[in-house]
Amino acid sequence: SGDGASGRWYLARDYNVFVAAKTDLTPQGASMPAPYMTNRAGRTVYAFMSDTAATSSKLPVSACADKCLEAWPAWPAPPALETLILPASLKLADFGVFERTSAGTSVKQLTYRGYPLYFHTPDVAPGATSGHMSGAWRAIDPAMFAATTP
């Protein structure tokens, strides 16, 4: 019953997704949201604001392809969405799967609140946030990220 208490106490689990906290600025000078989403290796997760989020009747539309995907690789979806292990502050219902074609290969990409999720190639160290740029690319603050109905 203490899992998620006060937004600070969580059971030790092998999470696929984490919510980290950071208060400094990125090299580009964009303010970093205090909480932000990472994968289990600590890589920051981003959304591209030029993408169109999924709705209850439409799939997402990604504006990132080819060279863009080299710099911003898609976060591959797990074989079954139900296998995501999340902290209590995140809801499985906010995640989805988007099937896209990249270089002639079908890839299943994880989505959050309808938006396809990406990593930034230069962000190799846990906690690196060089991809957070006001406007185009945003590290995901789960509490503030636009809610949609996937």
List PLM regions with ranges:
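Compact beta-sheet-dominated domain cores in extracellular/mature segments
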Residues: 1-150
